[in-house]
Amino acid sequence: KSEQSSFSSSSSVRNELSVYHNSRQKPPAEKTNQSSKNIGKKAAPFKKQKRANKGSSGAQVLYAKDSGGAQNESLRSNEADLAKKKNPNPSGDTGSSKNQDSMAAQNVHQKSQMSVETCTTPSKSNLILESLGLQFFGREVTLFRLKNYLTSERHSDVDDNVVQENLNDSRGEIPDSTPESKMHHKLVLPSYTPNVRRTMRTRSKPLEYWRGERIDYQARPSGGFVIGGILSPDTVSSKRKAKGNLGRIITTANRKRICLENAPIKNKFMVNLNIPLGDPLQPTRVKDPETQETVLMDLIRPRDTYQFCVEHDELKVYKTLDTPFFSSGKLIIGPLQEKGKQHVGLDTLVFYVNLGYLLCTLHETPYIVTTGDSFYVPSGNYYNIKNLLNEERVLLFTQIKS
């Protein structure tokens, strides 16, 4: 009896230990529903638990070796444990537990598909990892880096497409008449080089700013600016400008050298007059102030009827009008010639410089007179005129007689 009592006490201790161990594995709702009928059946789950622990350790080893399959298995096991904890009745219908397991497996499968959505195939992900030079430090870090890389590639592709569209638009806007288009040979377009980091910007070589070359910037839809082309204006040949300026200078110089005597006479009248005109070669009828009678006098002297007076070397004096009270005429002085000092007596001489650059001496004071200037010599004084240029010059004079 003593042996039986000791055996029964030892078996009861063992059963209590197994019940305590199983109570920690099951939810709290199952602790109150235990009975002595289940005492003999609790020794087997202890061994199964060891096997499950061994299986979980093996799953961890597989997870270290192969990330894809191990992660899926671990996720499925975790989902199954959560489903068991949520179900308080372990003796429930087997059909509901099967449905829950299938739903958990579907959720795990969907989550795994969403997590690996960025890289479609493992071979592509491995190639991308090798090209980026990344090592496996964890599934989340690797997927995050892959996602950033793929999004950056998409943005770069969009930017390249925008740049290409802008370049195509710039090509279409330029007319065919221009010799150089916006797509200049100085543009450096981005090139794709695998395994080498390159910029995706459109660059340009140094421009000839002195010729007016400028960069044509265009705005992107996403913001910022891109190079749309190079503007190169048409150049005008400098030879034409030089010829045109030279011709203008020559014509103005020739106009200045024209003498008034050789200037052509215009036979066209600006206004048609309907009145009778007198003959310039015939004398004109005028009234004598002393006798109050009408007399004939020569008042007009055409240029072909000038009276020649003096000619000394290149000095010429023409008298155009000669009356008892005054006389008028024209004085022509040759290049670098001098008229000479002369006394006017009791008369008065009035001069007008029609064309020239002269040195005029009035009594004892020299002056420089040019075209358009006038001067006169009073009675009883001397005067002298010298041409300072190497060209013929003309003066008009009037002599007032005393």
Curated annotation (Swiss-Prot):
This is Centromere protein C. The MIF2 homology domain II targets centromeres and binds the alpha satellite DNA in vivo. The MIF2 homology domain III can induce CENPC dimerization/oligomerization. Oligomer. Component of the CENPA-NAC complex, at least composed of CENPA, CENPC, CENPH, CENPM, CENPN, CENPT and CENPU. The CENPA-NAC complex interacts with the CENPA-CAD complex, composed of CENPI, CENPK, CENPL, CENPO, CENPP, CENPQ, CENPR and CENPS. Binds to DAXX. Interacts with DNMT3B. Interacts directly with CENPA. Identified in a centromere complex containing histones H2A, H2B and H4, and at least CENPA, CENPB, CENPC, CENPT, CENPN, HJURP, SUPT16H, SSRP1 and RSF1. Interacts with MEIKIN. The gene is CENPC. Residues 196-218 are annotated as: MIF2 homology domain II. A motif (Nuclear localization signal) lies at residues 25-42, 239-257. Gene3D superfamilies: Jelly Rolls. Residues 1-118 are annotated as: Disordered. Keywords: Cell cycle, Cell division, Centromere, Chromosome, DNA-binding, Isopeptide bond, Kinetochore, Mitosis, Nucleus, Phosphoprotein, Ubl conjugation. It comes from Ovis aries. InterPro entries: CENP-C/Mif2/cnp3, Mif2/CENP-C_cupin, RmlC-like_jellyroll, RmlC_Cupin_sf. The modification Phosphothreonine is found at T193. PANTHER family: CENTROMERE PROTEIN C (PTHR16684:SF11). It comes from the Eukaryota. One of its GO terms (biological process) is spindle attachment to meiosis I kinetochore. Residues 1-12 have a biased composition (Low complexity). GO terms for cellular component: kinetochore; nucleus; pericentric heterochromatin. It is found in: Nucleus; Chromosome, Centromere, Kinetochore; Chromosome, Centromere. Residues 44-53 have a biased composition (Basic residues).
